[in-house]
Amino acid sequence: MRLEIENGLEFVNDPVVNELGKICFFHPFTGNLTNKLSFRSHFNRYSFYAINYPGHGNSVINNPKQLEFSYWLEITKQFFDKHNLKDVILFGHSIGGGLAVALTNYLSSDQYKAVLLEAPLNPAIVETPLNIVQNLIPDPDSDFAVIQKCLVYNIEKKLGANFKEYCEREKQKSIHQNQRLKVMLEPSTLKQNIVLINAAFLKLNCPALWIHGKQDGIIKYLPSKAYYESLNNKQIQFKAIEAAAHTPYFEQPQKFLSLVNDFFQLIS
């Protein structure tokens, strides 16, 4: 799989012969499309597409408007049109999950087939303490260990004596690499994004699988489940994974892949 750059945006356009389907991946906040290379390896008979949005991977930020959700929706629509993508499974993690849902209100109905969500941004984010959300990009005096525990279940036990050093290293990396993204964590910005995501959830009319870690400290499980139940949409399956926080694919890959395999068989 080859990463390309065009007009400052890094992307993957990787069709396969005799494909079983098409997957477009939408990365999480401060993540990038390489986060799911192992997922793509598992589903290697599917064509794979993805964009690194401005400020992520090797995609550049030319102006602040490129960090707006509406801009991400627009360039994704252009990407789909340029590559003539049809019947795509929209797969998103965290903010990428919110983007995947919002796109169902933005793409034409023949451009997408189903939605796969991993701990997606949804209106339940209001139940997460604001200091947790805003410290996803830390300040020098932030306790980044708290954030790591929200992201990965039992991470302190998993890393043992290396935990403190790991947190400091990740903190410094984020401070140096991600500061320009911090505007995306402002309450007013999140509110605008949630309005778009909620509107799309309310109208969602394609099969969807929503996978959420029960110990998620970023987008909490119980409020997310309550929001899902309020939708009363039989097209959406909601599946919880134990011993997983905000990254269930990496924390419990076999359970995650089993759920996805079943879903892909259902929609094939």
Swiss-Prot record:
Source organism per UniProt: Mycoplasma genitalium (strain ATCC 33530 / DSM 19775 / NCTC 10195 / G37) (Mycoplasmoides genitalium)
One GO CC annotation: membrane
Protein name per Swiss-Prot or TrEMBL: Putative esterase/lipase 1
One Pfam assignment: Hydrolase_4
SUPFAM superfamilies: alpha/beta-Hydrolases
InterPro entries: AB_hydrolase_fold, AB_hydrolase_sf, Hydrolase_4
Protein family according to the UniProt entry: Belongs to the lipase/esterase LIP3/BchO family.
Key words, A-Z: Hydrolase, Serine esterase
The organism's place on the tree of life at top rank: Bacteria
GO molecular function, one term: lipase activity
EC numbers: 3.1.-.-
Keyword Nucleotide-binding: no
Positions of the catalytic residues: H27, S94
